[in-house]
Structures are given as C-alpha cells and as structure tokens.
Design a protein with these regions (language model features):
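Charged helix-capping and loop-helix junction motifs
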Residues: 119-125
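A residue-level signal for conserved active-site and pocket-lining positions in enzyme catalytic cores
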Residues: 16, 53, 77, 104, ...
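Glycine-rich, N-terminal phosphate-binding loop of Rossmann-like dinucleotide-binding domains
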Residues: 55, 107, 167
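A structured binding-face within diverse protein domains that lines the active/interaction site
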Residues: 89, 106-109
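Surface-exposed, charge/polar-rich loops and edge strands
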Residues: 1-7, 22, 94, 98-103, ...
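Short glycine-rich anion-binding loops that position phosphate/pyrophosphate groups of nucleotides
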Residues: 57-59, 108-112
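N-terminal active-site beta-alpha-beta segment that forms phosphate/nucleotide-binding
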Residues: 2-99
C-alpha cells in the first residue's frame, strides 16, 4: 500500500527512536568509547580545528566523551544554539559565538545513501543546506542499529558527508569508502 511520505517517515522515526532508547547503558558506554577510537583513527576527515557537536538526548549516542577528547587534542568544541539557527557557542568555555568547520549531527536513522532522518523539524537540514556551500563537513553519529536500508527522502532532506557508528566509518562523496573499526 502506498503511504504518504511524511507518514512513512513518522513511522520509521518512531521505530528507530524505540530501538535507540532500548540500548542498554553498558552498550551505550562501549559505543561512546568506540566513537572516540574511530574519530582518533579518522581525524583526517575532520576539517579545521573547530567542531560543533550536540548534547545527547532521547537515547542519542553519547558524544560528550568525544567532545572532551577533542578538547584535549586541541580542537575548539561548540554546540548549536537551538534558539537561533546557524549560531554556535563554545562548549566548556566562555560561550562565545563560534563558526565550526565540521559539524557532528545526531541521527534517528540513516541509510547507505548518506540520508539522515532526524526528529522531523528540519533544523539540521536547514543548517546543512546553508553551511555546506561554505565548505563545512557534516558527520552523522549513530548506533549501527539505526541503519535503515532505504529512507524515504523529500526535496528538503540533506545528505551527510560521513556517518560514524560504533562499528565503522562510512564516507560519502569523494571521501574514501567504508573504513572498518580497528581495536
């Protein structure tokens, strides 16, 4: 039966948010540590020295340990201002306005075509659309369980450049293809 694309996305969103919320604390901790290791091994994909990330909620993969590691390595880390699109402020610093070179985005579900499904508000799609022409790199982070073979896509949906899970790094466009995790 043909479904309205918005309804189909809503159903997928609900399904994958439930999958994400059901991940236990010990696996979540493992995934956060694996994310740090994969980032360390693949820092050549990171553009510039200023990286924006997010504060996890709703079962999102915990990027706070990664943010701490990036600070330790000398990167400037920023978080988006949810009240003002395209504004970022320093994290663990003076909260000054920052312009990131690389943006780490949360993901509800992703596919092999580098499509991401988020909460449905279009916030990250708008950000990607506005900042990609400026050469910014967009990295989606998720649990491998959030993989969906083919996501429904609308005209406004924006693709990611890289997707990192606890298991591997997937690179799109002109970037090298899938890099397996090394321990």
């Amino acid at each position: 039966m043909f479904k309205d694309i918005k309804q189909h996305k809503k159903e997928i969103r609900e399904q994958y948010r439930t999958i994400r919320k059901d991940i236990d604390e010990s696996y979540s901790s493992y995934a956060a540590n694996s994310l740090i290791n994969l980032f360390n091994q693949n820092l050549s994909y990171v553009k510039g020295k200023t990286i924006a990330a997010y504060i996890p909620m709703d079962g999102e993969i915990n990027v706070v340990p990664l943010m701490c590691r990036l600070l330790y390595l000398g990167y400037k880390v920023a978080i988006p201002d949810k009240n003002q699109l395209l504004r970022f402020e320093g994290w663990n610093e003076t909260n000054e306005d920052v312009i990131p070179d690389t943006i780490i985005t949360p993901v509800v579900a992703f596919d092999d075509h580098f499509n991401r499904l988020g909460f449905g508000g279009g916030w990250y799609d708008t950000m990607i659309e506005k900042l990609r022409p400026l050469g910014k790199i967009f990295i989606g982070v998720a649990y491998e369980k959030q993989y969906c073979k083919n996501l429904p896509v609308e005209k406004h949906d924006q693709k990611l450049d890289i997707i990192i899970t606890e298991m591997c790094v997937r690179c799109g466009g002109g970037l090298p293809k899938k890099a397996d995790r090394k321990e």
